[in-house]
From Swiss-Prot:
Binding site for S-adenosyl-L-methionine: G60, W62, D80, D96, D121
Catalysed transformations (reactions): uridine(2552) in 23S rRNA + S-adenosyl-L-methionine = 2'-O-methyluridine(2552) in 23S rRNA + S-adenosyl-L-homocysteine + H(+)
Name this protein carries in UniProt: Ribosomal RNA large subunit methyltransferase E
Enzyme class: transferase
Organism name: Pseudomonas fluorescens (strain Pf0-1)
GO molecular function, a single term: rRNA (uridine-2'-O-)-methyltransferase activity
Sorted UniProt keywords: Cytoplasm, Methyltransferase, rRNA processing, S-adenosyl-L-methionine, Transferase
Predominant location category: cytoplasm
GO cellular component terms, semicolon-separated: cytoplasm
Function: Specifically methylates the uridine in position 2552 of 23S rRNA at the 2'-O position of the ribose in the fully assembled 50S ribosomal subunit.
Family label: Belongs to the class I-like SAM-binding methyltransferase superfamily. RNA methyltransferase RlmE family.
Keyword flag Repeat: no
């Protein structure tokens, strides 16, 4: 079957992407590693000994970065619907995060010890039609925020990929009620054509009873 011009164009951009080449050189599994590295360089969100949950982890770029930064005294639980090759000292849970059974596995892995940081690079399979894609993307963001509320310790932080569009303003307003500080950034390593941004949320206020 012949490749479409669109897919061939993407492949050409991918092969020539400097971050793809750098990832291969540095031993990272994806160019996404540099988004987290850039966030880390500016904001120092990840520290040795932290307990962290990584959502939408496959192929493992963010988990690789996080595992190295938290070190042997830290703990990292990663989850994705796709398979992910193992990373030393990383607990991986494969399954659909939107299903209760998978969520229960994540909560069981976290146990009674609350976490310092939740990171999420999740995104649905994009069709290219915003009317279809945005509700799916926002649904994942809402579920990630719900989980963060359940497992973050007071003062904990949250980093999530989010797309500007319908539901964005409401989500931001909701997050501001739950965290002391919210900041939106677009890393240099994000593709210019992408609508993705990252929300950094500091200082979780704890669950209201």
């Amino acid at each position: 079957m012949a490749r479409s011009k669109t897919s061939l164009g993407w492949l050409k951009r991918h092969v020539n992407d400097p971050y793809v080449k750098q990832a291969q050189k540095d031993g990272y599994r994806s160019r996404a590693s540099y988004k987290l590295l850039e966030i880390q360089e500016k904001y120092k969100l990840i520290r040795p000994g932290m307990n962290v949950v990584d959502l939408g982890a496959a192929p493992g770029g963010w988990s690789q970065v996080t595992s190295r930064l938290i070190g042997g005294q830290g703990r990292l639980i990663a989850s994705d619907i796709l398979e992910m090759d193992s990373i030393p000292d990383v607990t991986f849970i494969q399954g659909d995060f939107t299903e209760d059974a998978v969520l229960a596995q994540i909560l069981e892995a976290v146990g009674n010890s609350q976490v310092d940081l939740v990171i999420s690079d999740m995104a649905p399979n994009m069709s290219g039609t915003p009317e279809v894609d945005m509700p799916k993307a926002m649904f994942l963001c809402e579920l990630a925020l719900d989980l963060a509320e359940r497992i973050l310790k007071p003062g904990g932080n949250f980093v999530i990929k989010i797309f500007q569009g319908e539901g964005f303003d409401t989500y931001l307003k909701d997050a501001r009620k739950k965290f002391d500080k919210i900041q939106m950034i677009k890393p240099d390593s994000s593709r210019g054509s992408s609508r993705e941004q990252y929300m950094l949320a500091w200082g979780y206020r704890g669950r209201s009873e």
